Amino acid sequence: NIGFDVGVTKVPLVCQSCIFDLPVGDVFTRPDKAMAIKACENAELNEPKSGCVGGGTGATVGKILGAERCMKSGLGIACVKIGELKLGAVVVLNAFGDVFDTNGNRIAGLLNEDKTGFSSTEEEMYKSIQPKKQFNTNTTIGAIITNGKFDKTKLNKIASMTHNGYARSINPVHTMADGDSIYALSVGEIEADLNTVGTLSARVMSMAIENAIKSAESMYGLTAYKDLKF
């Protein structure tokens, strides 16, 4: 009974990045030692999975009107190789806004009242300019991993540039209802241009976001992209 009160339970405050998914599933379920060991074992299999696994299990998008009209999301992955340069992205998509594919098509987010199509989160926001209480426990967490050689300062810039991928794929994004974060890591194998890697990182992050939507499964009474009827 110790920690920050989030309504349905209390969460211990430690240094971390996490999504708020406690309204989905059993609020009292917690990771244990056996799950941690299994996660380490699975990491050695080199069989990356996406969708409603790991951090993506309880992820949702399009929550301006609450859980009743949002959609199921998940964990997304994407990777590219240009010459010797390798770059991968992973994202847990738990966004306040709507989601678009790399061609600009809306693929997930706020559903209309009878759930026969999409509504626009942005347009819903414009119905009133007065301060309002919104579903503000949203976070999209991503990471970029590259074999390019970069120090901490340059990786910070790459992470910053990668947020362009969020902006292309999520709207609205970076709101006060979001806790959007991106980490950048380097294994330091080859020389690479920072501007090129930063620009490419945004593109690959957009690909990972699309994957998070298209690989998710309907569950907990929430509809996923795969099961849309329109």
Regions found by a protein language model. Give the residues of each.
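A structural signal for small-residue-enriched, beta-sheet-centric alpha/beta enzyme cores
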Residues: 1-230
